[in-house]
């Protein structure tokens, strides 16, 4: 608890010298936060039939891969306050979206979710460091990713675009390219390393980062087997204007003497209302305390999947999300007119996602596919049953 309190004070810019600890003691305590040796946050369980066999090696793997960018850990656990409603195998019908509680590395789970559909796009943010604590061992990250993305192939069209958000990890004072083996595996299965984008999260996090600059970005890896042109989603600065400034500050007309729009304008680019997005995605990260302001230790802002969804899919198309988390991608799909098919392995986070969706999208009906019952009815029945059993 002392370590977490010091980390919180450092984050808000408090002078830690006033705590009475020496500079060396403070550095050692904050190192525990950076190395992930405080409460909270293992990566998602391995996919996962091999999880039990990997439990012993999992502890060693935990020490090898740490999140060096920010303290995402916290003692908060949604399941600690109330028993989960959702159970493994549940499929929740949320408007025209589907959310299944299960293992995204299990082809049977993916088949139950998709029901023969295939998605045009996959946008996801897998756990990549000590982010979530399932009290079941962290497993092996490569095995997790291989299992999930092997099963995902049955959920995706051959021309699907696949975008994966990952952040940096530091260990032993070095940045660790932990994704290398997984990317090589993806290439061996025919996925091209099509693009590598940067998510600019805004101002860097406060604190001392062992001499590194304050972290303020993550990556988005773009894989595909076939090209798809990005949609033009960004308004052009001079759209609709009849004049344009030259580099020297003088102006030039965008119309000819006959009044017609010229075919070419600024820097020999055609006049247009919209353009394709930049490869640097400028979206502020979520801020707040886990359990008070946010309900998931690695929640990403709705604007991030919205950005990708609008760039690489059209209204009415299907988006696949194998790491459903707290429902961010599903919310983005509803707001943009896409159809989401999401998997989440942890029942407590399925409940968190449903509650968040009910708050942000109150018009959507939420029913259990197996019975057609609404979520509240299922919750009442299952919690009553749990009390009787107790």
Describe the residue ranges of each PLM region.
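Core catalytic lobe of class I
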Residues: 1-351, 390
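Generic detector of low-complexity/intrinsically disordered segments
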Residues: 18, 264, 363-366, 370
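Non-catalytic, charged low-complexity extensions flanking SF2 helicase motor domains
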Residues: 29-32, 370, 382
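Serine/proline-rich low-complexity intrinsically disordered segments, especially terminal tails, linkers
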Residues: 59, 127, 367, 376-379
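Short, conserved SAM-binding/catalytic segment
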Residues: 92-95, 354-368
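Conserved SAM/SAH-binding loop
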Residues: 104-107, 370-374
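Conserved P-loop NTPase motor core of helicases/translocases
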Residues: 372-385
């Amino acid at each position: 608890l002392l370590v977490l309190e010091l980390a919180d004070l450092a984050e808000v810019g408090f002078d830690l010298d006033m705590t009475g600890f020496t500079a060396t003691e403070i550095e050692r305590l904050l190192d525990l936060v950076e190395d992930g040796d405080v409460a909270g946050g293992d990566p998602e369980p391995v996919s996962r039939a091999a999880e039990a066999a990997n439990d012993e090696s999992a502890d060693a793997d935990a020490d090898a891969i740490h999140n060096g960018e920010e303290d995402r850990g916290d003692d908060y656990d949604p399941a600690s306050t109330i028993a989960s409603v959702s159970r493994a195998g549940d499929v929740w019908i949320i408007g025209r979206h589907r959310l299944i509680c299960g293992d995204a590395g299990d082809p049977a789970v993916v088949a139950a979710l998709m029901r023969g559909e295939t998605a045009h796009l996959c946008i996801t943010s897998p756990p990549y460091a000590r982010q979530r604590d399932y009290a079941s061992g962290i497993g092996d990250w490569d095995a997790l990713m291989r299992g999930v993305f092997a099963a995902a192939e049955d959920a995706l069209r051959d021309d699907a675009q696949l975008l994966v958000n990952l952040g940096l990890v530091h260990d032993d004072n070095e940045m660790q390219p932990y994704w290398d083996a997984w990317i090589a595996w993806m290439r061996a299965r025919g996925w091209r390393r099509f693009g590598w984008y940067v998510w600019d999260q805004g101002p860097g996090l406060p604190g001392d980062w062992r001499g590194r600059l304050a972290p303020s970005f993550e990556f988005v890896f773009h894989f595909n087997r076939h090209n798809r042109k990005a949609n033009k989603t960004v308004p052009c600065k001079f759209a609709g204007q009849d004049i344009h400034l030259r580099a020297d500050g003088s102006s030039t007309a965008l119309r000819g003497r006959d009044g017609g729009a010229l075919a070419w304008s600024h820097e020999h680019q055609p006049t247009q209302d919209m353009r394709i997005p930049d490869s640097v995605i400028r979206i502020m990260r979520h801020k707040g305390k886990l359990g008070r302001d946010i309900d998931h230790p690695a929640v990403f802002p709705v604007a991030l999947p919205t950005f990708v969804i609008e760039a690489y899919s059209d209204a009415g198309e299907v988006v696949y999300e194998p790491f459903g988390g707290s429902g961010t991608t599903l919310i983005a799909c509803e707001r943009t007119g896409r159809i989401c098919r999401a998997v989440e392995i942890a029942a407590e986070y399925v409940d968190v996602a449903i509650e968040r969706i009910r708050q942000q999208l109150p018009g959507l009906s939420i029913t259990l596919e197996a019975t057609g019952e609404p979520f509240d009815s299922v919750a009442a029945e299952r919690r009553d049953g749990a009390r009787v059993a107790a």
